Amino acid sequence: MIHNISILGSTGSIGRQALEVARNLNLNVVALSANSSIELLEEQIREFSPRLVAVSDKKAADELRVNIKDLNTKVLAGNEGICEVAACDEAELVLNSIMGIAGLEPTLSAIKAKKNVALANKETLVAGGEIVTNLAKKFGVKIIPVDSEHSAIFQCLQGCNDKKQLKRLILTASGGPFFGRSLDELKNVSLEQTLSHPNWNMGAKITVDSATMMNKGLEIIEAAWLFDMDIDNISVVIHKESVIHSLIEYVDNSVIAQLGVPDMKIPIQYAITYPKRVKSC
């Protein structure tokens, strides 16, 4: 199991939960990055003592330098700084939970530095799937999915040695907070209702995307690149309880599924400890 980890997007929902896992596993957090939430980032720095941090917002980075001048942590700024954190020498694994397309370039930087990547940034593969997967093959790097559905598929595939035996991948979807509502009922839903996911505790953007089902469309593309699968062989089924996270079906019509409580710390921890499993927090 790894001992040193870098976490990109450490002040977001996945990043905060990743730090909980790192704390429970007693990992050495060598580098962190954030967009602009320097108050929380400072708390994280003072607890985990990373050697390197980066802040996208350059003004916020300047402020952070002043706030932690009593510490030995180096503060970098801008996208260049984020990419430097992604390629940090000491890190054995880079967990990328940056939101949106901003996560693509740091992923590429980590791969070029020959770092295995725990990927929670689906836009990396939606926008640059061919580039990322080809580069990972070139540098001998593993891309380990953190999204619960893709982590489930990844786990189900551990016993599959021949892709030709696969018939299809089956992603599950809760349907979000508005499943079963009519088009007329959807006209007057509020932001508060949209952000009230029935099962998962997630960031605002992905919660909205889940409510509209847009997130599932992105996940199909992500799965196609992660598992080198034709989109026609990827299905989606509604499973409101979010206990079955995803399934794989073989050509003999047998099905293997991965189940668990809807807690993102479980796939986060599996990505960090892979191929081992340890007691969860």
What are these regions (language model features)?
Residues 1-281:
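Catalytic, metal-anchored helix/loop core of enzyme active sites in primary metabolism
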